[in-house]
Amino acid sequence: MSMVVQHVEEKAVHSWSRISTAGKKALEEALLVFNPMSQDLSATEAQLVAFLQGLRDDGFQPTILRSGDVYGYSSCTASPPSQTKLQARTINPPATSLPARAPQTAKSVPTGQTTLLPVPLSGRLAKGSTPALAKHTTTNLLLSSLKQSNASNTSGTTVGFPAHLYPGVYPAMQLSVVLEALVPLKTPCLDVKHRAQSLQLSLAKSSLKLRKGSGNPQSKAPRRITSKGLKYLTSKGPGAGLRRGAGTQSNGARMKGRSTLGTKTVRGKAPRTLTKAVCARASVAPAKTKTVRVRAKVKQAKPKAAKAKAKAAALRGKAKDKAVQAKAKAARTKHKKRPKGYVQTRTGRTSLKNSSETVGQKRKKAEETKGLPPKKRARCVPRSKARLGTGTAKPQKSQTIKVDRKCSDDEVRQCAQQILRVNLSPVVLLQPLLPV
């Protein structure tokens, strides 16, 4: 039994990939959602099948919906309908044919625009479908039942969902099936002129009609909501009071009137939008002139600011020159106040000496030293610091004597004697006395 369930699950998983290229893309997206990090989609497909089987083993009952159950068209896994049902459907018009009154309304709809007519989804997916799918393109049970109900002219009855044809479809799914059968997947935006006509066609051909009340619907005039309240729109003219019998013609007249009202409102709104655009352009023009004026003022202010900066720099330079000149003058005045002979003594008292006297005294001293004999001259000349005694010269704290291996003891002794001015030689020289 488990083998049969596994086979059904595999068929349910593989059925999407056999429908069309769109089905393959949907399967790939589902597999990527199941395992985003996978690189091999076949492996993830096997994992998905194993996951469903594991849920069933744990006690859960996952409901696997086929494409025919959800969308109402037959896939390759769905069993083809029996020939008895097909023979019963031959009395009704075929699925691809429209009623006799369709060409009259189709002339008003321009080409190149899709309407909300019920179109079988199998026809839209015929390009990417397999050859096996071509056999069942016209066997859409839901659409055939809907068109069978359209053939009957009963207007006061409503047709429900054919639950006997789809026993496993839930109520919420029934709504999705009906919507998918009536409305295409991709409907482009229609113009205002042809929306009412397309709605008329879709409502006239579909089986989902509103129940009509006991009162006459023609007695009610169309209403229009304005700022002041509700207003009833009545037709003016000689045929205002006369109205023809109910039916498709009256409905068509109503829809035409509504479409003309829509076009009139659109035409009335167009000049308003044009006037608004003109006002916006007129308001933009003075703003542009203001910006131009502001830019011109900024350009004029730039050279003024440059001139002000140049003046400030010139004033700073002049101030610096004046400060330098003031310092030079102050230095000159200091030198002028103190003459050359103006000498300050140690006690702090100032005494003025003549420079000529000092020069004469120096000359006299030099002449005296020249005239004296050499002995006296030697006494007058000041002795150097090296020849001065210990009393006059500053005492030396320490003095080093460099001694090498080549230096002898006598040399070291002589160096020490020269430093200390002491004769430390043990050698005593005996000299005879000179005769008198």
UniProtKB/Swiss-Prot annotation:
Pfam families in UniProt? CCDC71L (PF15374)
Q: Does the keyword Phosphoprotein apply?
A: yes
Cystine links in this protein are none
Modification Phosphoserine, positions:
S129
Q: Give the coiled coil ranges.
A: 264-334
The record's section on InterPro entries has: Ccdc71/71L
| Compositional bias of kind Polar residues | 105-116, 344-359
Disordered as annotated region, ranges: 95-119, 210-258, 314-405
Task: Provide ranges: composition bias, Basic residues.
Answer: 329-340, 373-386
Which keywords label this protein?
A: Coiled coil, Phosphoprotein
Q: What is this protein called?
A: Coiled-coil domain-containing protein 71
Q: Which gene encodes it?
A: Ccdc71
